[in-house]
Amino acid sequence: MNTSYDAVVAGAGVWGCTIARRLAETGRKVLVLEKRKAIGGNCRCRTIDGIEVHLYGSHIFHTSDEEVWKFVNRFCSFNDYRHQVLARYKDRIYHLPIGCTLLKEFFGRDLKPSELDDADRNALFDAFIRGYTSKQWGVPPEKVDPSIIARLKVRDTFSTDYFDDPHQGIPLEGYNELFRRLLDHPNITVRCGRGYRLTAEKLDCPVYYSGPIDQLFDYRFGELPWRSLRFETEHVARRDFQGATVVNYTEVSVPFTRIHEFRHYHPEAKGAFAKPKGTIVTREYPSDWKKGDEPYYPIATPESAALLAKYQEEVARFNAGSPHPLILGGRLGAYKYYDMDKSFAAALAVPLV
């Protein structure tokens, strides 16, 4: 397929939109292909009754990377939202992350995590980690990759801020506007409802691909394992449902992992998100991924690492025989569990060709 473009970007999420903008600002003509009907990837939102509803679960921007912070602020301003997460266990509410506040609430005495004995640590693990992790990943926590458990935050302070990063917030005009502005450039053409298949079309320009790497090669070596999510969203006819943006339900007997209440992401309540009518809540249900589902979290195992290596070798073979390189990235293309700022950073670091 001949094109009049200097590059094609497949996927209009964080990584793809950032790549497209960088290419456009160097003077290249860029075609962005997005298989969904709208841009924004899993940050896509919809305004319902004056509330910015995150369609694919809560997305909070936070970073300590000054380059990333400077880049995103070219396209939007952020509010001063600081993320806090509550946990519900046996009909009581606790403040995450694990720190002095939660220990005081759970044990009824002043403690630091470093002062816990084995019995206390086991009780804490069973209450707040075991059930939630089992639901999220579909296996006991002992079988989860250690890097996942390492993401859990532990503090020797009373702070209940979930993130430590100095820069945090939600775009004042919403995530959709951030992505619209990223792609608002005369050198960028966007086609939604249009994916990219390597085996179906050959392009005479570089391709930057952020879809699933196994799908790119028609699952030649088999499917990489993912966890998927299902969301149930409802309007509740009262001003506040749970008093927080996110409440984790840590017991395995509760089928969902958490409830999101999106009105709390805009405490400034001005502009498009002023005076919401009632509130919107979403329950999040993890599930095993199968073809046709949305892939969310890569499952890191020795087997998946070996399978990923086979697909990466296919990319290398393709590039060795093609004058137009294929560059993969993003959560799906790299098969990595990225925070949003890390996906921006990865896209900013890609050498452009």
Where is each model-derived feature located?
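N-terminal Rossmann-like FAD-binding beta1-loop-alpha1 element of flavoenzymes
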Residues: Y5-V32, P351
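Glycine-rich FAD pyrophosphate-binding loop
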Residues: A24-D49
